[in-house]
Amino acid sequence: MPYLASLARQCTRFADWTESDTGQASATQYVSQFQGDSNHTVRNDCAPSPTCQSTADNLFRQARTAGLTAVNYVEGATTACSSSGNATKHVPAMYFKGADDAAHCAEQVQPYKNFDINHLPNFAFVTPTMCNDGHDCSNTVVDAWVATNVGAVLNSATYAQGRTLVEIWYDEAHPVPNLYIAPTAYTGSVATPVTYRSTLRLWQDSLGLGCLSGSCGSTNLRPLAGT
């Protein structure tokens, strides 16, 4: 993957990134990522339902309560609050149903076609299709998608302003493949052990939000990455 390799030479990489919920399915990893602790109802990539959901506080709710915008963009979807054309297990915002989460689903889960580089929310989480994320297609396809889509962000006026952090990571493996890209990001590999909850803490710190559960005791990646 030549384009991703070129990015890796220009940004921060964490060499010892462990899954927060080792051995769990994708949906569990994603939901835990956004709420900061293990979820015991979202199991085996089940579809969102009364028996497969989370009522815990989460980054989307935190941002909304603070007057910020947080959006999960879903490639392949054509309508809001839908994972049609994609895999629901990779769309974490669909699983949060506590407080007023469900009432805000349409604003927090948007088709990727609505992703506008010049009008970004405070936090954007992009879910590529199962082909473009490498699950069903080759690394060549993945690299081409990243070159087109991430490349557009990195070449934008918004990114040039110096206030945008771009992250690329996978939901499983050890070490978890990851890249942290920003105008201020350090270059090279960081040996400090981290987890997905460390990333949640970075997001919260960057947005001026408090920590949640497991993120409170996790290593903050922000000073390590220079972002």
Label the predicted regions.
Residues 1-227:
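Flexible, surface-exposed loop/gating regions in the mature catalytic domains
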